[in-house]
Amino acid sequence: MTVRETRFPSSSATATQPDAVVRFCDTTLRDGEQAPGVAFTAAEKLAIAGALDAIGVHQIEAGIPGMGVTERDVLREILATDPKAEIVGWCRADHRDVEAAASCGLVTAHLTIPVSDLHLKSKLERDRAWARRRVRDCVVDGTDRGMRVSVGFEDASRADDAFVTDLAGELRDVGVTRLRWADTVGLLDPVSAYDRLGRLVRAVPGPWEIHAHDDFGLATANTIAAVQAGFTWVSTTVLGLGERAGNAPIEEVAMALRHLLKLPIDLDTTSFRTLAQLVVGWPLPAGKKAVVGESVFAHESGIHVHGILRHPATYEPFDPEVGGRRRLTVGKHSGRASLRHALEQCGITAEESELEPLVEQVRLAATRHKRGLDSRDLPGTSRAGRDAGPRAGTPTREEPV
């Protein structure tokens, strides 16, 4: 199997350096499928894994070997496609799970251990000493079986930082390839994330991964803060699919890293909308969804449309490179520039003196119908049909970029 290169920057490098490369571990097929009501068939898992591999994801957390025979069979099928991405099996810190992962032919396993006292005591009735022994023994078990092993610290945001730091150092010594810091219930904020995670990276150098949940709408922000603090891996899902409020969306994280932090992101971002449609179906669930939503490149305000027509960067932070299309809509907030442009697309040239009354008609019609106007109906506002006024519909003027 040809595995995509997963070398890491040196521990002295900060992720905000221009040459720093951030790696993606996508967990749509594991954490994403744990969202209530989500259940992928084997064929769907194969298709999604193939699409993630095609866009350049470095690791795909493809399932849970310990779930049973069916899950292990799907993992084997994914491995049989010979992906460039590393295929990872998610495991509890349990020798039975390690054995199950090895039986699939996986070369990479991810082990999870709770590190907060809340989880250890309330969920497992265990203590920190047990967690140390358990995860260390399972790491050794996995490496003895010839697997690359990473470890995730569950509920790290509510854990004692000193304990996490000590445990991380011990696990580095026994050969873990990477450590994952999980904000399991989304309690982190970007400022504390930058502070806490920066101290952690400095104390225990090496590859770290952030796994953020979106319970307070901060998963993407916390992921970006972690990268700024020195983390070199990010855990994501398509559209943020996941338990409760979900995870950090791959499309948001990738575009933020590329356009806000100016980091090299070696993913095919032009396929993000296609990937999202494959995972959740068509149409996409939210028009206002960041990066891939239907309304991300839609403009109605007269001031905005005027600016877009002169230079798209005036009101777009990035081009529709993710597979989207620019839409200039006509509605209540449209001005003369918007209407003139829409009419020109219909082959109509309006005199400047005609535009103002036509704009008023458009605004009245949009208010009455509570939606934008279809540019195909705008000829009804010309001299021949002005009395009828514009008809309401859906804004459909699209411009591929």
From Swiss-Prot:
It catalyses: acetyl-CoA + 2-oxoglutarate + H2O = (2R)-homocitrate + CoA + H(+). InterPro entries: AIPM/Hcit_synth_CS (IPR002034), Aldolase_TIM (IPR013785), LeuA/HCS_post-cat (IPR054691), NifV/FrbC (IPR013477), PYR_CT (IPR000891). Transmembrane segments: none annotated. Signal peptide: none annotated. It is an enzyme of class 2 (transferase). It comes from the Bacteria. GO terms for molecular function: homocitrate synthase activity. Keywords: Nitrogen fixation, Transferase. NCBIfam families: nifV_homocitr (TIGR02660). Belongs to the alpha-IPM synthase/homocitrate synthase family. This is Homocitrate synthase.
